[in-house]
Amino acid sequence: QEGDPEAGAKAFNQCQTCHVIVDDSGTTIAGRNAKTGPNLYGVVGRTAGTQADFKGYGEGMKEAGAKGLAWDEEHFVQYVQDPTKFLKEYTGDAKAKGKMTFKLKKEADAHNIWAYLQQVAVRP
């Protein structure tokens, strides 16, 4: 499914409670200085659990990154709809849990947010 970045910008409002998009120069692209979750600038293609300034990753996310998870659309869409289920399946660890408690209800929103992130959050 092809995402719509404009719809993704609107849907990203749901993410701003916990996430920001702040580029390497410190310019805020989206969000309101939230620190609960990692900065999503550079998330496209990034190994899971490796955003340098964020220290709050759970063990399940770190394990997924160690097992090779790099964020692409397919994995992002699955993860944001049910983080704990995704991490259990990806890592093969029945005890893995996602620290992200929010679940995005609509798959279309997930595709749209990914399209938005591809537009504004990719490192040049």
From Swiss-Prot:
SUPFAM superfamilies: Cytochrome c (SSF46626). The modification Pyrrolidone carboxylic acid is found at Q1. Heme c binds at C15, C18, H19, M100. Its main location: periplasm. One of its GO terms (molecular function) is electron transfer activity. It is found in: Periplasm. GO terms for biological process: photosynthesis. Keywords: Electron transport, Heme, Iron, Metal-binding, Periplasm, Photosynthesis, Pyrrolidone carboxylic acid, Transport. GO terms for cellular component: periplasmic space. Binds 1 heme c group covalently per subunit. It comes from the Bacteria. Belongs to the cytochrome c family. Cytochrome c2 is found mainly in purple, non-sulfur, photosynthetic bacteria where it functions as the electron donor to the oxidized bacteriochlorophyll in the photophosphorylation pathway. However, it may also have a role in the respiratory chain and is found in some non-photosynthetic bacteria. PANTHER family: CYTOCHROME C (PTHR11961). This is Cytochrome c2. The lineage of its organism: Bacteria, Pseudomonadati, Pseudomonadota, Alphaproteobacteria, Rhodobacterales.
